[in-house]
From Swiss-Prot:
Similarity annotation: Belongs to the insulin family.
Protein known as: Relaxin-like protein AGF
A Pfam family it matches: Insulin
Organism for this UniProt entry: Hypanus sabinus (Atlantic stingray)
Source species taxonomy: Eukaryota, Metazoa, Chordata, Craniata, Vertebrata
Positions glycosylated per UniProt: N37
Amino acid sequence: WPRGPDYTERRVMCGLQYVRAAISICGPNMQTMRPRNGSGPIVPPPDFLAMYGMARYKPPLSKKCCSTGCNREDFRGYCYL
């Protein structure tokens, strides 16, 4: 997939951890994002994606949940399935 010049340096604050290569960890496929309880609509947070330019990337799917306690209110409580 395409990589931006700062791909490996992009960071997303999740709880107290800075996650390197956050796009590959926290931004797999925005269409698969659901609330942590498994119900509700599949809704990517547009301003969060725009902030980190994630919409341009399509990294491999990841089952890692990186959003518990994220510092973005509209991103909190979401997991990637």
